[in-house]
Amino acid sequence: MAISFLCVFLITFVSLIFFAKKIKRSKWNLPPSPPKFPVIGNLHQIGELPHRSLQHLAERYGPVMLLHFGFVPITVVSSREAAEEVLRTHDLDCCSRPKLVGTRLLSRDFKDIGFTPYGNEWKARRKFALRELFCLKKVQSFRHIREEECNFLVKQLSESAVDRSPVDLSKSLFWLTASILFRVALGQNFHESDFIDKEKIEELVFEAETALASFTCSDFFPVAGLGWLVDWFSGQHKRLNDVFYKLDALFQHVIDDHLNPGRSKEHEDIIDSMLDVIHKQGEDSSLELTIDHIKGFLANIFLAGIDTGAITMIWAVTELVKNPKLIKKVQGDIREQLGSNKERITEEDIEKVPYLKMVIKETFRLHPAAPLILPRETMAHIKVQGYDIPPKRRILVNVSAIGRDPKLWTNPKEFDPERFMDSFVDYRGQHYELLPFGSGRRICPGMPMGIAAVELGLLNLLYFFDWKLPDGMTHKDIDTEEAGTLTIVKKVPLKLVPVRVQ
């Protein structure tokens, strides 16, 4: 009798909780949502280019909408006003990260900055990174590396210009940014290292981004064992683990090299700075770092830092070459400001060419390398544009859609750098119509390092060379078709003929 009474009581109690939650949710003003299928939710509405699919859905259902990816509800934000509420007004309440299978693995169980959920450990790591790794003084200390690598690229392109052979700029600029980053972060020089192979690094970046972007069933169907089983059969587990072991081998090699007492070094790189903290941890316990933390940091740099700068430069050159009058104007302004007899470009020259800075802003607007800010997760109940967003809800900000919003930009699909003339709009996270690096507590800490490489790289390309199309091509043949998921590249590699300007 007592057991029967207890069972009835428990069933009644659980039912009351369930209905109380249902009544509470019914009072919420949830964002509009497209019709969904059972189980899969709205997954069938997401195509090969997720940012474009989400943009088209937002045009129909509004700038704040609720989607369901499997069993997981996701709020998608596609307007400046809504982005400002998420990234500034409610920044503290929604600056955590969801714990995803791929990010957990590659960050070594969240021992990084980019993927780690919000908390005291994350705050200590980010503070260290901003103070020791990405501060202005540190960025400037790597200036000679950026200038040397750009000069090396100019020499390579000049050799190709002799016989007027087409150059795959997509590869050349990837190797430029990779060379800079490997010297800055890992102390490894592509031109001298026997261990680092450029082609293999490019393949590994592609593999890592593809594995992270591939559908991981466990992230959207968190049913005990079911998602894991599907991922095992689909090969997603193997893809992620293959990337993990390749990255681990690379990082372990360079860390071992740094621990070698006889190692000669040209400068103190990021690994040196982190190893120094590990050696001094007995004196200062405010930050705890291990070798796994170094590898987690390096994974962030590897995934976010290598190809994004190259992608930005490729899109900028693509848009300029498509418009002969525009590239002539940009190059004319650069050469007039710098003179015609420079043998080498330095970073001091960048401040003399404001038109180039407008070109970069316009590239960020029309072609952000990462069109969707890494997903945030709410830690409290918030309201965005009057809609309720409960705790533990993932939020995606579609910066690509905001950059093409006709309410914000005149002729948004046109590449027009002069729209930024006499404009205060900047890309450093304070203007929510232009967010290539995000904003708030989760803004990309490597932004100054990335911007420095993009500005100097583009300045060298546009000062020293005119750019011609391969035989048989016209400007109308240059397409801007996109490819990718985490980062968006030009689908057809950009091949041009460099003509050295004397």
Swiss-Prot record:
GO CC, alphabetical: membrane
UniProt entry tagged with the keyword ATP-binding: no
Binding site for heme: C444
Topology term for the membrane: Single-pass membrane protein
GO molecular function: heme binding; iron ion binding; monooxygenase activity; oxidoreductase activity, acting on paired donors, with incorporation or reduction of molecular oxygen
Lineage: Eukaryota, Viridiplantae, Streptophyta, Embryophyta, Tracheophyta
Listed cofactors: heme
Superkingdom, taxonomy of origin: Eukaryota
TM ranges: 1-21
Compartments, as annotated in UniProt: Membrane
Keywords: Heme, Iron, Membrane, Metal-binding, Monooxygenase, Oxidoreductase, Transmembrane, Transmembrane helix
EC number: 1.14.-.-
Primary localisation category: membrane
Protein name per the record: Cytochrome P450 71B19
SUPFAM superfamilies assigned: Cytochrome P450 (SSF48264)
Family, similarity comment: Belongs to the cytochrome P450 family.
Keyword rRNA processing belongs to the record: no
